[in-house]
C-alpha cells in the first residue's frame, strides 16, 4: 500500500510540473480568451424584465 502512496505522490508532482502554464514568474494574461471587459452570457441584468438593480 505504501508503494501506491509514493507512486501517487510522485505522479502528482510530475503532473503539477507538466501542467503549469507558461514560465515561472510570468505575468498572467487575463485577456487570453478575449477582452475581459466584455459581458458574459448575453443579456445584461438591467434589461431583464422584473429585475431591479
UniProtKB/Swiss-Prot annotation:
Tissue specificity comment: Expressed at high levels in salivary glands and midguts of adult tsetse flies.
An example Gene Ontology molecular-function term: serine-type endopeptidase inhibitor activity
Compartments where found: Secreted
GO cellular component, one term: extracellular region
Source organism, top-level taxon: Eukaryota
Keyword line: Protease inhibitor, Secreted, Serine protease inhibitor, Signal
Protein name (record): Tsetse thrombin inhibitor
Gene that encodes it: TTI
Amino acid at each position: 500500500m505504501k508503494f501506491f502512496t509514493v507512486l501517487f505522490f510522485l505522479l502528482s508532482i510530475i503532473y503539477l510540473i507538466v501542467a503549469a502554464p507558461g514560465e515561472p514568474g510570468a505575468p498572467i494574461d487575463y485577456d487570453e480568451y478575449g477582452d475581459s471587459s466584455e459581458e458574459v452570457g448575453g443579456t445584461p441584468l438591467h434589461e431583464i424584465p422584473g429585475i431591479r438593480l
